[in-house]
Amino acid sequence: MGKRPKRKIVLFLVEGKSDQEALQLAIPELYDEIDEDIEVYFPIIRKEEEEKGGDITSTNYVNKQGKRYWVHPSNIEEAIYELFLDDFFDKEKILPKDISEIIQIVDTDGAYIPDECVVLDSSLSEEDSPFYKDDKIACLDVDKIVKRNEQKSENLDYLSSCKTIKVKQKTVPY
């Protein structure tokens, strides 16, 4: 039995179903214009066990061994593999060598807003906090949002500087 031919796969890592649904309408058509052999996929982050959706840059996660951890620049590449790709590769029968490029879609959620623009608003309900305004973020817990923004901006700064990331033992354009 010979070697399986290498596939040309582009992955768009997304935070949730709405991102996936919006992007998978137009993006594959654009790649078809470049090369019809390119396969485009939209894996959604696995938050906990089978729960889908979330933001890898600003929250903590539970790994497959049941350990909860915060994602930081020192472990975000490993977290991307574990939370986006591990189960997805098994399901789609994809090998790291098949990946031509990884593109990650993230939102900033006010990560770069100055700390003094995060303000307490005790009139908000738990469901409405944080509440994003044009010039500030109103919330029930200022320290929590400031820390979230710090973590998120550190991770976004790191990811935006990456030309490649490690996927198992393979280096993939990012």
Identify what each model region corresponds to.
Residues 1-174:
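Acidic, divalent-metal-binding catalytic cores of TOPRIM
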